[in-house]
Amino acid sequence: MKIIVVYTFCLFFANLSLSQADNNKVQSAINEFASAAGLENAAISFMAYDIDNKTTIASHNGEMAIAPASIVKLFSTATAFETLGKDFQPKTEIFYDGEIDSNGVLNGSINIKGGGDPSLGSRFFYDRDQQSAFLNEWVAAIKSKGIKEINGQIITDGSEFGYDGAPDGWSWSDLGNYYGSGPSGCVVYDNMTYLHFSTSAQLNDVTTLDSMTPRIEGYSLLNQVTTYNSSSDNCYIYGAPYSYDRFAIGNLPKNRSNFEVKASVPDPELLLAQEFEKALANDSIFTTTRPAGFRSMLLQGALPIDYSDKKEVLSYSGKSIADVAFWTNMRRLERLKLVTVALQEALITSIDTGSRDSTSKCTKRMEVGYQEVMLSVQTIL
């Protein structure tokens, strides 16, 4: 029996094992929860619905629409399982154009075609010192083609999901922070960078940004963060997608060195190209032209890249939908936004090849698959 359980609380509700025989227990459990001391003024909406039998298993204010928060990720991950399958792995493909001469010089460019793999260099799948290990595999693939030098550039193409940067409606106060990282056809390192601060021993004193990992060329931070007498991070980064001008406000603990604050990456597509160029240079394979993201080329009038006349170097598979969904559902908000929308974009691309639909259209198409569920999901995202 297929059962979809959707619950939206101001507090987290414990997972319930559902079967037809346990229906009364489910209703009793939600009634007990809703009547608990301290929840008298809480907004609680719950419904468990049996799609096969088209019957309500249990309900408490089931028709009341409230802000669903992190629970909406269940729609994306469930639809990904249903549509793509648990074993689906997004791919990042590497191509080259031009010819390789007798000296190993490629007279052409390397193209990286992103497939929206949210696991590429992700801290959820790799230890900190192994997050860039995939680049070594990519470099080895380039060398296997006999390429020793590139008379051209690295071009990353994240156009598979379009270039919205972030869905409409995302909070301005989120976008510059790590939990506000938007989806991209080229995702790398969770589209996140670590800012390393040192702080004074004095209260209400200035802080200093010492470095960042990975280093992002052109990143500029107006730092208005001061010290305070606490051990927690109360720093907030502000900045729009594709904008390298950021500013920071709030507080950090006093008398610290190398205090890390996580922030979003302005342009993941370009960062991936730059990271690959560095990895090649570390193996003495140099390019003659600086790396570029395809978005900037589009702004200059470039046409979509035709891969039919290019030669494939490597097709790199990311983690499976099952693996990605596990971490998405089990972790808090920090992982929800980027991966949930990345899954939605992957879904819409699989349904409509070549589509450049916005996130709002992806969500509307997801609603169609859940019309039998007695919920209003118009407010998702």
Where are the model-predicted features located?
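Beta-lactamase-like hydrolase cores
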Residues: 20-52, 56-64, 138-146
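Extracytoplasmic
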Residues: 41-43, 61, 69-72, 89-91, ...
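Soluble periplasmic/extracytoplasmic beta-strand elements of cell-envelope proteins
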Residues: 45-49, 57-59, 93-95, 109-115, ...
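A small/polar active-site loop signature that marks catalytic segments
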Residues: 226-381
